[in-house]
Regions:
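Bacterial N-terminal signal peptides that target proteins for export
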Residues: 1-8
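C-terminal segment of classical bacterial N-terminal signal peptides
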Residues: 13-21
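Substrate-binding/charge-relay-adjacent region of secreted/lumenal peptidase catalytic domains
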Residues: 24-124, 129-374
Length: 374
């Protein structure tokens, strides 16, 4: 289970001032002139993905001024800079840092002409969220999609590295496999007997971190929205019971399922994770930032691609309203090496900085060091 005290303190530090199993690295190999995709080197083949199966993809085009982005972020986040705090809205970000408008329109048109349905066109104007049948995806990216199994878990993957059509030149694409899976650090032990030992409640944490003086000054999260990038939705009645038990204000719980059109559920895809991590996060974020609004954005499953769409929704759609973001899901960094999602996520999190969002990754667990090797 996550060490909630450290997590709560990390989130609080940003909220009160506001107004992702290890695996060794494998390189692509070439076979018959084509480079095999990394997940195609794992496990054994089960067969072919059904031609009619829905495949969701996330496309990231190069921005016109990508080379300037890091410098801009440094300027708006450094207290000594005259640009400090002059953050962008998602629309302003897209207007300046987005892809060339003609290239962006051509990419959208090319996808539509080849059977893709456009689900979202985020305001950053570099990204495209779409889906198509497996046979259309195979034809467009010139690679078969296979079903494979590795260590008992079934997954799908593109056999070869995708061939990106000219209209998408320079783009990276996630969703062609679901091999990499995120996980929480939650551990369940419902029959634990505390005995003579002590446990921590919200007021204990507030006392330990000397938060009470801040509360008295009105620094309690009021007017701030915390977003949670998660899988398996927390239930409002559970949060209400936690708040009632500890005499906390009834902080709102807002819920959104991603991608567009998916259904909100307490299950995390086909896994057994459930919603325990989401419940823990909603309980303790609102136990510390007691007047904040908590907005959970719930992935359809635990794959890295599922979380791409969640991150995008928070950065783009919620860019106007969300001040702080927490996520307790991740995986060993080596699992992500060479994946399109790594590039996509890095770009999205840099955009988040440009918008003034503060992100915390499993701050009470291993943070960003999920390999736990430093």
């Amino acid at each position: 289970m996550k060490l909630f005290i450290a997590a709560a303190a990390a989130v609080l530090a940003s909220v009160l001032t506001a107004a992702p199993a290890a695996a060794r690295s494998i390189q692509p190999i070439r076979l018959g002139g084509r480079s095999l995709a990394l997940p195609a080197l794992r496990g054994t083949t089960l067969g072919h993905v059904s031609p009619s199966a829905r495949i969701d993809v996330y496309v990231r085009l190069p921005g016109r001024r990508d080379a300037e982005l890091d410098g801009f972020v440094d300027a708006v986040t450094a207290p000594e800079s005259p640009w400090f705090g002059r953050y962008l809205t998602p629309e302003q970000f897209g207007s300046y840092f987005g892809a060339d408008p003609f290239r962006y329109a051509a990419a959208v048109r090319a996808l539509q002409q080849h059977g893709f349905v456009i689900d979202e066109l985020p305001p950053n104007r570099t990204d495209i969220v779409a889906h198509a049948s497996a046979e259309n995806v195979e034809a467009f990216f010139a690679t078969p999609l296979d079903l494979r199994v590795d260590r008992g878990r079934e997954y799908y993957t593109n056999r070869y590295l995708p061939v990106v059509p000219p209209a998408l030149a320079g783009a990276v694409v996630s969703g062609l496999d679901d091999y990499v899976q995120f996980h929480p650090m939650l551990r369940r032990d419902p029959n634990t007997v505390i005995g003579g030992r002590f446990s921590w409640g919200p007021d204990d944490v507030a006392a330990a971190y000397e938060l009470t003086p801040l509360y008295k000054e009105g620094l309690d999260g009021k007017g701030v929205t915390i977003a949670n990038a998660t899988c398996g939705a927390a239930v409002p009645s559970d949060l209400a019971l936690f708040q009632k038990t500890f005499a906390l204000p009834a902080a709102p719980l807002v819920s959104t399922a991603e991608p567009t059109g998916s259904h909100l559920t307490t299950a995390c895809g086909r896994t057994s994770y459930g919603n325990g991590e989401s419940s823990l996060d909603s309980d303790w974020a609102t136990a510390i930032a007691r007047e904040a609004t908590f907005h959970q954005v719930v992935a359809a499953g635990p794959s890295n691609h599922d979380f791409d769409t969640v991150y995008s929704y928070i950065v783009n759609t919620l860019g106007h309203s969300v001040h702080v973001v927490t996520t307790s899901w991740g995986t060993c960094e080596r699992d992500m090496k060479g994946t399109a999602s790594l590039t996509i996520d890095e770009k999205l999190l840099t955009q988040a900085k440009a918008e003034g969002q503060h992100w915390f990754s499993a701050s009470g667990d291993a943070g960003t060091d999920d390999c736990q090797d430093g």
